[in-house]
C-alpha cells in the first residue's frame, strides 16, 4: 500500500468513525443513510459499502441495533410501555420496532419486558446490561429464549 493510499484509508476510517459516533449519539433522532452520508460528504451507496466492510453490518442495521439495545434497557426498567419505548428510541413504527426487536433478541418486546423484570431482579444494572445484550442480526437462537 502506498503512502497516499494508506493516508486515504485512514481518512476513510475516520469518516466512518464519525458516522458511527453520530449514530451512537443521535440514535433517538430520525436518521437515514442519506443524511449520514451528507454529513461526511460521500454518497449513500459508498457509505453503506464502506461501513459494511469496516464494521460488518450496514449503517441502518447498526442504528437499529443501538436502538434495540437502548430499548432493552428501558424495557428492563419496567416503567414504560412498549409503545413509549418504541418512540423513545427513535422508531416511528411499532410494527418495525417489534419485528426488529424479535429478530435481535429472540422474543417480542412485551415478552422481554415481562421476563427481564423477573430474570434480572437483584442483579446490578451494569451486569444485567452485559447478560441481556442483543446478538447481531438474525443470530437470535431459534429455541426457547433465556435472559441469564
Task: Briefly describe each language-model feature range.
Residues 61-63:
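Short, basic-rich loop-to-helix N-cap that marks the start of a DNA-contacting helix
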Amino acid at each position: 500500500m502506498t503512502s497516499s493510499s494508506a493516508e486515504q484509508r485512514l481518512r476513510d476510517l475516520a469518516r466512518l468513525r464519525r458516522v458511527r459516533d453520530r449514530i451512537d449519539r443521535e440514535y433517538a433522532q430520525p436518521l437515514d443513510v442519506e443524511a449520514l452520508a451528507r454529513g461526511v460528504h460521500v454518497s449513500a451507496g459508498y457509505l453503506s459499502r464502506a461501513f459494511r466492510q469496516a464494521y460488518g453490518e450496514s449503517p441502518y442495521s447498526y442504528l437499529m441495533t443501538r436502538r434495540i439495545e437502548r430499548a432493552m434497557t428501558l424495557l428492563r426498567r419496567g416503567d414504560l410501555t412498549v409503545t413509549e419505548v418504541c418512540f423513545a428510541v427513535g422508531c416511528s413504527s411499532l410494527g418495525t420496532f417489534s419485528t426488529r426487536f424479535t429478530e435481535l433478541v429472540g422474543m417480542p418486546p412485551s415478552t422481554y419486558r415481562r421476563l427481564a423484570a423477573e430474570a434480572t431482579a437483584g442483579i446490578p444494572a451494569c451486569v444485567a446490561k452485559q447478560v441481556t445484550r442483543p446478538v447481531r442480526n438474525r443470530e437470535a437462537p431459534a429455541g426457547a429464549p433465556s435472559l441469564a
